[in-house]
Amino acid sequence: MSWKRSERLMDTIKHYSNFPATSVSLRQMVQFGEKPSTGTLFRASQFLSEELPIRLAHRVQELHELPDGLNEMPSICRVRDWYAQSFDELTNLSRPNVSSEVKNRLLKPAKKTELTSKGSQNPSIKPGQYRSAPETGNGNGNGKEAKGAATARRYYAAADDGQEWPVELAAYNTKFAEVLEKIKRRHDSVVTTVAQGILEWKRKKQRMQIDHNIQAFLDRFYMSRIGIRMLIGQHIALTDQRQRSDPNYVGIICTKTNVRELAQEAIENARFVCEDHYGLFEAPKVQLVCNNDISFMYVPGHLSHMLFETLKNSLRAVVETRGQDKEDFPVTKVIVAEGQEDITIKITDEGGGIPRSAIPLVWTYMYTTVDQTPSLDPDFNKSDFKAPMAGFGYGLPISRLYARYFGGDLKLISMEGRDEWTSSEMIRSSQGRTQGNRSMRLKLSGQLGMEVSERRQVGDAEEMLMDKGAGAPWWRSVGMEEGM
């Protein structure tokens, strides 16, 4: 039986959209440890059963209220219904009946508690830049701010594990994780489906580019999606982790992410795609300069995505600038620098550079230098859909959101007229320029080798959004007190 949205459901979603999201910190996510107890995991499940519907409701409302007919595009309506259906499933999931004694145990703090660290503003993000509704001035744009309320709701809250927990709690944890897995699969193709919706709108309106309002919406929407999937993916992994665990992982967070290994893997993947796309015997070579022992706490999947997209961009520029029939291409360089607070990954290529006037367009969704945007086949909305090497104009904008999500940034420096360009991804901040036509810097945030409590925390989508005064965490949006 196919799912259908009802007017009553939409009224409920509208009600939920008035509540602000709660922020979740990276610190809270790793406090679960290798094998979280049934009680601790149950409390986290209860938090998400309340937090995720709020976040989903924000997205449904924003999709429903898109201007200029964009909300009427078939693909946009499809995505809106996915979010509404996921909201419906979460809010209708029945909770177990537990005795008052068990409830008291769940609310009783664990004997051993840890202090959580405070966050800091990401200098790459302007206050309110990713706010859901900038014009409201109310907190994150989704309701009134409730000062101090965040401390009452937390993703990580260790329960008293002095005794065995009822089997009903373990059964609920498993069921909740199954529902999250179903939702995650449903939303796998949201990025490509929204891209299709934008294409539909551009064709109908005969527009060549999207305007600032739609660009801002896409930034907010995709940043929020990163936050939602981060929470869902982490909780699924934590539930599964009780059966099999890796000492270097807490959920999907790797406490010892090896930068060199991920960079080498991204290089190999990007070169393979380049060879396949252009029919080359051998793609341009990539030189990696990185110490073997640089590691830090991060989500490997995020870093892999950023490195792959920027490398793919660089290799394509080199091949198309030099010509596909050239036997020897100039070497693209990947240099990893470790600082006290930042890790900077600089990718320098000789791909011809970009005119200064065109640099802002690089970060615009649906902007591409490919002559013709590839068409999506009828099955583009399936989870196994793979986008082509280039042509949608999503690679760099989405990669920058991933970098900014955890406090870093992705910057492009272009020197037109020379033969190099540098693309650097920054895992935190760094200064410096590259020689050459294009330079991308990926900055990744956090002091390396330190406890999470000593690392700068990053905020999650909804509350980067907040426009609070100095000293207030901008990342509160994810649903926790510290922001992730």
For each predicted feature, which ranges?
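Conserved ATP-binding N-box helix of the HATPase_c
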Residues: N269-V273, V299-D328, G339, L396-Y405
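Flexible, glycine-/charge-rich segments associated with ATP-binding catalytic modules
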Residues: S2-Q46, P67-N71, R95-V98, G128, ...
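Structural signal for hydrophobic/aromatic residues that build the beta-strand cores
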Residues: L52, F221, F296, L303, ...
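ATP-lid-like helix-loop hinge signature
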Residues: L280, N313-E350, P374-F380, M415-G417, ...
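Beta-strand cores of modular interaction/reader domains in eukaryotic scaffold and signaling proteins
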Residues: Q287, M297, K333-I335, K346, ...
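Signal-transmission coiled-coils
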Residues: W3, E7-Y278, E282-K285, P300
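Conserved catalytic submotifs in the C-terminal HATPase_c
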Residues: A283-I294
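Short acidic-aromatic loop segments in the C-terminal HATPase_c
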Residues: W363-Y367
